[in-house]
Amino acid sequence: GIGYHETSNLDEVWVIGMRNPYRISLSNNNLWIADVGSNIQDEINFVSTDSNNLDLGFPYIEGNLSHGPFTDDLKFPNKNYKKAILAERIGGLIGGHPINFGGYKMYTYGVMNGDLFGIKLLDNGIVKTKIIYDDKTFESENALLSIERSRNGIYLLTLNGTVVKIDNSW
């Protein structure tokens, strides 16, 4: 991630001000970026690839918290989660073979306690979160470790090695 705050005139620079972007997913000319926070909040950022020079604020902003001066061009993240023991976010994916509820493609992500969520963008730009999977096999002693997509579906990997397929057929 680029944590400095300098203006760039390069068209290929879409986003600055991220701490540790570790999972990027591209869908319909948009980027979904999972970004690990420093010690308080993680972020899931939605960025249109039509924009460039977008500043997500790090190190001045972490999630929705300000650590420094605001500027007019900072953009707050779409969704963020407070860090806690066994509650870090496991980010996510969209596109290709998306989980699809009500006709919406969803960015799928989880937290290490096993809860799985989706974020969808509606036509009016509103972002909503919906729990899309809840299974008691993903309790804290069997935490969710990874979400991966293949041509056959979306899979979850747990701490004890269990692989669970999820898709839009349920």
Question: Residue ranges of each PLM-predicted region?
Answer:
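Beta-propeller domain segments
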Residues: 1-131, 142, 149
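Short loop/turn motifs that cap or connect beta-strands within the blades
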Residues: 132-136
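Blade-level signature of beta-propeller repeat domains, shared across WD40, Kelch, NHL, RCC1
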Residues: 146-170
